[in-house]
Amino acid sequence: MENFLQQLKTLSSAEDFMQYFGVPFDQKVMNISRLHILKRFFQYLRQETPLAQTDELQMFTAYRALLTKAYGDFVTSTPAQEKVFKVFQDTDGKQHVTLDSLRASMPQRAAAA
């Protein structure tokens, strides 16, 4: 199991994870959603029963299934719809900036420069 965990520590990108676990992926989906996919994957991992008590093959299989599930979420949906990150949760996908707030920020920016 230690070997499996050490190998995971060497992975640095979403593509690295997908390749390591043998999950086929569309690069277009990865270009748009790579951070969202990894965040969802780690959310799924946290929801699972403790996996550290199983052997490496069971862990690999469970991790692969969760990564595949996370990737699938973004094949059929968008990051804004999935609301993985706080910015999407708080604004419900909408942004609202009033002209008054823009005007108020202008002199502050000019003075700061």
Curated annotation (Swiss-Prot):
This is Nitrogenase-stabilizing/protective protein NifW. May protect the nitrogenase Fe-Mo protein from oxidative damage. Homotrimer; associates with NifD. GO terms for biological process: nitrogen fixation. Belongs to the NifW family. NCBIfam families: PRK00810.1. It comes from the Bacteria. The gene is nifW. Keywords: Nitrogen fixation. InterPro entries: NifW. Signal peptide: none annotated.
